[in-house]
Amino acid sequence: MNLKILGIDPGSRNCGYAIMEANKGKNILIEAGLIKIKPSTLQYQITELCEGLDLIFKNHSFDEVAIEDIFFAYNPKTVLKLAQFRGALSLKILQIHGDFAEYTPLQVKKAVTGKAKATKEQVAFMVKRLLGLSKDIKPLDITDAIAVALTHAANLRVRV
């Protein structure tokens, strides 16, 4: 059975997304990119993020949606901003799609590389290898979103 998965890596400057099809252990990347968030007021940035997500859902339908949870940050302002972005994304996904899966950065790293403490570069290398891609994927926000989708695909296979 083919499953179309949307993987999301929320960020304060860019939100990475990946659209992947998973079928019997074979994963095919359909599209990946960024919702770019311009420097502005927080309210405008949240609106921009939600409009970008609306556009993705307008152009695609999904069986599953997975989002990476907030990572630990030393700057409290950054954590608060990310939490607000994540809350807005969560609400938008629930309104458009319904339920979604959440994975911590450690879960994503472990699922993709086998090591919970892997670097972003190690994750990027394994994403490229697992999907059989010839070119590097940049920026790493996109790679992280693909890794979230791969993690969810692997988790679904375990549950089925």
UniProtKB/Swiss-Prot annotation:
Q: What is its main location?
A: cytoplasm
Q: Which organism is it from?
A: Campylobacter jejuni subsp. jejuni serotype O:23/36 (strain 81-176)
Q: How is the cofactor bound?
A: Binds 2 Mg(2+) ion per subunit.
Provide the residue positions that the database annotates as binding Mg(2+) 2.
68
Q: Where does Mg(2+) 1 bind?
A: 9, 141
Q: Which SUPFAM superfamilies match?
A: Ribonuclease H-like
**Cited Pfam families:** RuvC (PF02075)
Can you say what this protein is called? Answer: Crossover junction endodeoxyribonuclease RuvC
